[in-house]
Amino acid sequence: MAVFTQINDTQLAEFMADYALANVTAFKGIAAGVQNSNFIVETGDEKYILTIYEDTATGVNPDDLPYFLGLMQHLAAHGINCPTPIMQKNGNILGQLAERPAALVSFLPGRGTVTPKPQQCRAVGAALAELHLAGADFEMRRVNRQGPDNWRKLYEKSQDSADEASPGLADFIGQELQRLETAWPQGLPEGVIHADLFPDNVFFDKGEVSGLIDFYFACHDMLAYDLAIMLNAWCFEADVNFNITKARALLAGYQSVRPMSAEEIEALPILAAGAAMRFLTTRLYDWLNQPEDALVVPKNPVDYLRRLRFHRHVTSAADYGLES
């Protein structure tokens, strides 16, 4: 979350007049994040998150907003702790503020973690499985635009300069892309996936998962791929060493709610390598193409190069701690 567009009291009051809520008593910007402008809005005893969707290179496509907001509405109605879009008096959940699309959603208690503990990994694994089950009857569809086709496109745009990030990187990515494209699984169970459930997108309160946020990469894809993304995001330490204790807990939590098929388990190593490739290629492209006036420093792509090298040597899901 971040603040790119500043708003004043008058603008906010006009926007909030479209909602059947108490008068605003306070609001403040939220400084973290990379895509949109976010504010905490207080109305008496209640708190909400106001998001202004920015027209930037990394911003959300306005055409996708009905999907994202509709998905949050659906998941919240099915018991998932995620932001619930607040409906305006006219029944809409998307409005306009500062000449940009904007939405108001419920405020969730808790906070994210930088160094997740094994018990948190288990809890979030179960929460991901619950999300997958809750999304099974969501009727809207959105293609995963961060899939293998996009990795190839980003690689081709970055290939000539890739070795600036790490010597030999261009050749390594080229070879690994070919391997992944050849072996990429087909026919696995699909449905709604979050596709970006990093530790900063999960809130914990008193040891329990209190909120899943930032659904702006959500789409329809293989469910096990979502879990593979989390293996990368939750189970490597700051020095990029793999923590099998955390991975074992994450997988056990997921399996306790939605047991994976034998085919999903067999595909987990290639899916985890693909997830690492996704973030390697996106971060490499961003690192090589940082605008001079960028408000956010691009993340180092080498962290995901190291993850990808680890996954190349994984022979089965047992290497991730999956217990049969």
Q: What is the predicted function of each stretch?
A:
Residues 31-42, 49-50, 85, 178-225:
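Active-site acidic catalytic loop and adjacent metal/ATP-binding pocket
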Residues 43-139:
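ATP-binding pocket architecture of kinase catalytic cores
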Residues 21-28:
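Conserved N-terminal boundary motif of the eukaryotic protein kinase catalytic domain
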Residues 114-167, 188-190, 295-301:
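A cross-family kinase active-site recognition segment
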Residues 260-272:
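All-alpha amphipathic helical-bundle segments outside canonical DNA-binding/catalytic cores
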Residues 7-19, 139-141, 153-195, 205:
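An alpha-helical support segment within catalytic cores of ATP-dependent transferases
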